[in-house]
Amino acid sequence: MNPVCLPDEKQGKTGVRETKMEDKKMAVTASMVKELREMTGAGMMDCKKALNETNGNMDEAIEFLRKNGQAKAEKKAGRIAAEGIVMAEVKEDKAAAIVEVNSETDFVAKNADFQAYVKAVVNQALTTKAANMDEFMAEAWNEDAAKTVKDVLTEKIAVIGENLNIRRFEKVETEGCVVSYIHGGGRIGVLVEADTDVVNDEIKACLKNVAMQVAAMSPKYVSRDEVDQDFLEHEKEILLAQAKKE
């Protein structure tokens, strides 16, 4: 580049100053912010910041949000997630899964985005081969095999803005019949499995009634034969004490 002589007082000793082309930043438009928000689910201001930081590069902006979301999720991980919902899914009466996913507030538990996420988690549990929570969190996410269940949870924490926790899951597979029952808008969930050669509406209605009874009474055992003797003696003591007071 040729030097250009500029007749001003800032020329320096030689009276010559070199000019350089400045890098031009791409203007971030509302449509770009909207597109990034639809792709990631992040907030509008977060999307705008990501685009500004990456000079409007959409792929780099997504990566920026993911990294930023990871940091946010780690900060939220220590907060108590005491609310949430229980959700169940049954497939062809032969397989079922039930999950409990916690949030910090009841407001988020009722949020459509959160409930859609829990729906995806229970569908994941329906096909899982995991024997425990660690294995479940490490397995590939059904909707995007490039991510793990834990990766998606971390992203969802960043989007929703609360600590979330997949607390527990159960999966049932049977040659008979399995039904589910969810009570109180997701406060209580029950799966009931039965050995049966016949599966029809009457059988399923009967099992549904059993599931409702389980939700109401929270029994610890299925039959008398399973009752632990120490537990039985303890309950007898309580009943005798109550009877004496009456």
Kindly label every feature range from the protein language model.
Residues G12-G15:
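Residue-identity detector for glycine
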Residues E9-K10, E22-E246:
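N-terminal assembly/interaction segments in proteins that build large macromolecular machines
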